[in-house]
Amino acid sequence: MAIILASQSPRRKELLRYLVTDFLIEPADVDETIQPSDEPEDYVMRMAQAKAAKIAAHHPADIVIACDTIVVNQGEILGKPVDRKDGYRMLRALSGGVHQVFTALVIRQGGQITTALVPAEVTFFELTDEEIQNYLESGEYADKAGAYGIQGGASLFVKQIVGDYYSIVGFPVG
């Protein structure tokens, strides 16, 4: 029996390695299109379940771990930015305000499915255009929900966190 992380996220890989040293990585490619009618909590759980199901279909006896993370700002679900302009739009919208982060965790083995939805709240300082442009220039924004990674350069944007830090990173291990 193998443990499979259904993610290509280096952050999730690093955090799982603290818990288990021997696991496989098999990213799940699923359609992450956000529909206008999607509720944030339902959407993020549906994505994590879809990723777990896709990998579990090929590995029914193994343990499959999948996660999905979204940022929600004033009711808008912010997934990964499509380009730098979208990243700028997201960071500008988050600047000086409070937003929510939801990470859904799904663990599947055979017919057994365990799920968790872990919320957190993040307050950003007011960001200058120069700060946003410098961060975008680093490239860190590109593969992250809400266009930022709290464990990187964007940690300087954070005024306050309420909830699970690791949920914001994308893998709630606490």
Question: Where in the sequence are the language-model features?
Answer:
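Cofactor-binding loop segments of dinucleotide-utilizing enzymes, especially the Rossmann-like FAD-
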Residues: Q8, A28, G110
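A short, surface-exposed loop/turn module that caps and links secondary-structure elements
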Residues: I34-D38
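N-terminal beta1-alpha1 ligand-phosphate binding loop
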Residues: M1-T21
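A local structural micro-motif
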Residues: F23-L24, K144
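A short beta-strand-loop structural module common to alpha/beta enzyme folds
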Residues: L24-T33
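Anionic-ligand binding patches
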Residues: I3-I4, E39-G174
